[in-house]
Structure formats: C-alpha cells, structure tokens
Amino acid sequence: MDKRHDPSRRIIAPHGTQLSCKSWLTEAPMRMLMNNLHPDVAERPEDLVVYGGIGRAARDWDCYDKIIEVLQRLEDDETLLVQSGKPVGVFRTHADAPRVLIANSNLVPHWANWEHFNELDKLGLAMYGQMTAGSWIYIGTQGIVQGTYETFVSVAKQHFEGISKGKWILTGGLGGMGGAQTLAGTMAGFSVLACEVDETRIDFRLRTRYVDKKATSLDEALAMIEAANQAGKPVSVGLLANAADVFAELVKRGVTPDVVTDQTSAHDPLNGYLPQGWTMAEAAAMRKTDEAAVIKAAKASMAVQVQAMLDLQTAGAATLDYGNNIRQMAFEMGVENAFDFPGFVPAYIRPLFCEGIGPFRWVALSGDPEDIYKTDAKVKELIPDNPLLHNWLDMARERIAFQGLPARICWVGLKDRARLALAFNEMVKNGELSAPVVIGRDHLDSGSVASPNRETESMLDGSDAVSDWPLLNALLNTASGATWVSLHHGGGVGMGFSQHSGVVIVCDGTDAAAKRVGRVLWNDPATGVMRHADAGYEIAKNCAKEQGLDLPMQD
C-alpha cells in the first residue's frame, strides 16, 4: 500500500477568523499547507503532489496528519522541525523564533543525484519539495505569471522593438509552472502555442482561464495562431502533443516561431517528461519495472527537442531556456552546443535581482477576495510611479482566477517590500482586512538560490555554483523572526543542480508582528543585493549604497 496515495482526501483550508490552532502564527502554516493541497491548486492532491513532477507538500498522509495535529497544539514559544516532509521534533525556542523550520531534499553533494534520491524516496526516507510545494507557499500558477510576463515583455523589448502584436511563442508544458506561460504570453501581447501530453492539464488551464483554446493537431493549432495574429488579438492554444515531436516537426516544415522556450518538467527525467512515442500509461508502467529505460528514453527525447530549439534559433527565433534544466539533459545525451541559447535569468531578469526585485507574494487567510483587492489598492497607493506594476495589478484582477485562498504576486524590491508588508499589517490591525495575511515568495529570488543552470547562470565573477548565499539567507531570515523558513535542494532544475531557501511571515496586526515584518522583509531582499554586489554588479553596488546597506568589503 502506497502511504502517499489516498484518493478519498479532499483538502480545503479553513476560511474566516475562527482558529483551529492556538494563534495565527500556527494557524497560518496550517492553512497554507492545506492550501497547497486544494484541488484547484495541486496537480495531484491525492498523491500530495503540488507541482513540478513529484514536488510534494508532505512525505506521506501519515506525516501530513501529524503535521496538522502538531500545528494545532504548538505553543507560541515552540518550533516544529520538518525533515523532508516529516515532522521530527518540537523544541522550545522563543516568541520571535520561527514556528516551523523545514529542510527538504537535502543530500551530501557526492550523493546529490536523482538515482540516490529516488532510492531514498522509495524507502520513504526523503521527499522532493520542489520550491514552494514543500515550503507551503504555493499559490497556484499565478505564482510565476508576473515573472513570466516580465520576461516576455523584456523579450519583446530586446528582439522586437517592444512590439509583440502578431508574434507568437512556442513552448512546452502546462503543469503548475508551465501553465503560466500561456496567460503571461497573451498578457504581454504574444500568441502562445503550448504543447502538453496530459489532456487533463490542458482542461485544467482552460477551466482556470490560463489557456484560451485546445487543439488536437498541429495544423489546427497553427491555424488558430494564424487567425488570431491576423485579427491582431493574441490567443493561447494548448496542443495535445509531445513537445519534442512538435518542435522537430516545425523545423522540418520550415515554420519558425518568433520566440521559443520550454517549461516541461525536464528537470526530472523519470517522472516529469514523457518520451516520444510513449503513452502516459506506458510510462507509468515502465517507471515501476525499468526506471533506467524511462530515463534514457526521456533524455533522448529532450535531446531531440533541444536540437530543434537550436535549429529554430538559427532560423531566427528568439530562443531561451526557462529554467527546467533541459539544456543539461540534452548536453548529457551528446548535444554539445545545448547551451548556445541563454537562460532567462542572465538574459532578461538579472538587473531586477541586482535591486532585490523579485516575486513578492501574499495570501488572504480569510479566504475573502476583497482582502486582496484592498491590498492591490494599497500597493498602487504606496508605489504610485510604476505604470508597469499598476498595469500588472489591473490585468491580474481581470484575468487571473484565484486558486484556493485568494493571493497576489507582484515583483517589488528592497525599497518596497518591508513598507508594503508594514502597511498590510496596519490594515489588519485597523480592521480594513478581515483576517491576517501571510507574505512569502518563490525560492527563485535574488538572494535565496544557487542554481548554475538557472538563477545564478553566468554570474559576473564566476560564482555560479557557490551555495553559501541561500544558506546565509535562510539563517538570517530565521534570526530575523520569520514565521517559517525552509531550505531545499534540487528545485526547478533537479537533484544536484540547485540549493535554495524560502521564507514566509504572518501579518497579524500586532506590534510584535510589525517588528518582525520590518526586519524580515528588509533583510531578505537585502541579501540579494549583497550577493550581486559581491559578484561585482554595478547596479547592485549602487543599490546597496543608496539603501545604506552595511557591506564591509564594498567600502
């Protein structure tokens, strides 16, 4: 019997102000853990899988139940320790310490590979936490929509003089992360053709308004794109097909998209990528009998897809890696020039990271969308001179369906995160908001990740693989008084290729919360400015000086 599979489970986080725990500081992690497994949020909630292949919220259902039980009895001077999705200890700390500390998927470097991890996983000794799955701050696909939107806007500026009308993006994957591409692309003015092998994912994206249309053949999909572009109105199409097949076929036909990328779960060749010519049922059966054959076939198909991406780049497409490690997989299969197209961070995002700008997100624990709309207005009030941000908030309200507890994300930096959070805390205190909010972020942020094939690719000083930085980030956030802090390995790009940390803090309207919020949401983005200043980026050095950061070696 698989202790991780229970189709009878239907998890919905409580709404409103009635507590199941002893305070909001423990109610918040409980609700957010439950929200990660909401049927409109998680990809396979019956298996505890939130997103990203096998990114889970808890190791198994026994562990999930015990975590909930412990959070409901936890005192405000105690801390729960969670080891790869398993609650392993409760210790007396103090009121400003985190209520939960989480470590997921971490392995000693020599053994930090999928083969060893999968053995531990089968033995029930480990859990893949991805980034926000095991750290209980996943908010559905909205979580990366704005970052993807910012990237596509940058692509238009760099390659098409800012004009995206009549242009289209080819991509793969409509899972928890990839599903953002279609909506973000159309928001940025592009049409999008996204290949997906799992029809239920396409249907889910249709239901949540992330995809406009579904196609079952390439000809049908291309006709939809062509019609939309002729009409001057972007459209997103989910094509039921294998990305490797489609990308290669477009090369064969001489059809060149304007932009090419991919967000399949290529980081996990065993569980995340369907080999060419295989059905999903065949792959599921083979995973139980011959893992090596699945991995080999998946990586061979990735090599086909990456070669097609390179060919489309040569034909004139703006081609970028979107952080799923597909280039590495293809390189290992003999595609020697797999890294000839850039990752999205060095190509488009790094200047933002240099100012501590990244994916700031918050969730209304009340369950009331009005709380989010009120905070949207507060963001506009406090940041009046950022039209791109205002445009994002307007589009998000109009086009993004909430999944589970209402949430919002917007990319803001060092100078704004703490003051926004303090304003939210004041709104809780004075009753403008009906219940507390939690504030967190993706682990994909300026100071919280080491990932040489993604966030820290091509660092100016060559420090791509130095992972001291996310460790320092987690330690500082713990010392600063975050409500829960997490330290993970392997998110985004898979085992052996990344280390990263997460942070969440509760705004419950108290003066004590205001002090914690002020520390955490200044220090957290400040570590990103510090990290990039240390690597030699002038934007970061100037930001550090302007914001008065004390960086001894920058004097």
Swiss-Prot record:
Q: Which SUPFAM superfamilies match?
A: Urocanase
| GO MF, one example | urocanate hydratase activity
Q: Which domain of life is it from?
A: Bacteria
Which pathway does the protein contribute to? Amino-acid degradation; L-histidine degradation into L-glutamate; N-formimidoyl-L-glutamate from L-histidine: step 2/3
> Catalysed reaction per UniProt?
4-imidazolone-5-propanoate = trans-urocanate + H2O
E.C. numbers = 4.2.1.49
The record's annotation in InterPro entries points to: Urocanase, Urocanase-like, Urocanase_C, Urocanase_central_sf, Urocanase_CS, Urocanase_N, Urocanase_Rossmann-like, Urocanase_sf
The Swiss-Prot or TrEMBL record lists the needed cofactor(s) as: NAD(+)
The UniProt entry lists the main location of this chain as cytoplasm
Which terms in the GO cellular component ontology are assigned? cytoplasm
The protein's location, in the record's own words, is: Cytoplasm
- One matching Pfam family: Urocanase_N
Going by the UniProt record, its keywords in alphabetical order are: Cytoplasm, Histidine metabolism, Lyase, NAD
Q: Does the keyword Lipoprotein apply?
A: no
Cofactor details (free text): Binds 1 NAD(+) per subunit.
Q: Which class of enzymes does this protein belong to?
A: lyase
Q: Which NCBIfam families does the record match to this protein? A: hutU, PRK05414.1
Q: Which family does it belong to?
A: Belongs to the urocanase family.
Role description: Catalyzes the conversion of urocanate to 4-imidazolone-5-propionate.
Q: What is this protein called?
A: Urocanate hydratase
Phylogenetic lineage: Bacteria, Pseudomonadati, Pseudomonadota, Gammaproteobacteria, Alteromonadales
